[in-house]
Curated annotation (Swiss-Prot):
Record keyword Membrane present: yes
Lineage: Bacteria, Fusobacteriati, Fusobacteriota, Fusobacteriia, Fusobacteriales
Assembly notes: F-type ATPases have 2 components, CF(1) - the catalytic core - and CF(0) - the membrane proton channel. CF(1) has five subunits: alpha(3), beta(3), gamma(1), delta(1), epsilon(1). CF(0) has three main subunits: a, b and c.
An example Gene Ontology biological process: proton motive force-driven ATP synthesis
GO molecular function ontology, one term from the record: proton-transporting ATP synthase activity, rotational mechanism
Protein name from the UniProt record: ATP synthase epsilon chain
The species this protein was found in: Fusobacterium nucleatum subsp. nucleatum (strain ATCC 25586 / DSM 15643 / BCRC 10681 / CIP 101130 / JCM 8532 / KCTC 2640 / LMG 13131 / VPI 4355)
Length: 134
């Protein structure tokens, strides 16, 4: 089976390195699917799911990414992620409660910087909920 290497890292550590037959993730331009021998490519990643399918299609690992960058060259896909973790670790009820608390907190803040930080946290939590449910 044709395959390529997928490496996922954050600023802190290497998260995974594995062989894949297919990789799907969300870029700032929309969802993209990567197959073996893909042309060289660089993209900004948006919040959403990242799916890695094994070369023989017997396993599919799904992760949540909060953004980052993708580079493809020489049959190697490198994902540099802001935040990444397995989708099964998302607790929808906890994220929904967090969103409600953050919205209440948002009503009380006075500076634009505080508002932007809270809005980003809300956006990430909503993206986690969407990724888990879809």
């Amino acid at each position: 089976m044709p395959s390529f290497d997928v490496s996922v890292v954050t600023q802190v550590k290497k998260i995974l390195e594995q062989e894949a037959g297919y990789l799907r993730l969300r870029t700032s331009e929309g969802d993209i699917g990567i197959l073996p021998n893909h042309a060289p490519f660089v993209a900004e990643l948006s919040m959403g799911k990242m799916e890695i399918e094994s070369p023989n299609k017997d396993r599919r690992d799904i992760y949540f990414l909060s953004g980052g960058f993708l580079e493809i060259s020489d049959n190697q896909a490198t994902v540099i992620a802001d935040e990444v973790f397995p989708i099964e670790k998302i607790d929808v009820e906890s994220e929904q409660a967090l969103v409600e608390n953050l919205k209440k907190e948002l009503e009380k803040v006075s500076t634009e910087e505080e508002k932007r930080k809270l809005q980003k946290k809300i956006k990430i939590s909503l993206a986690k909920i969407d990724a888990k449910n879809n």
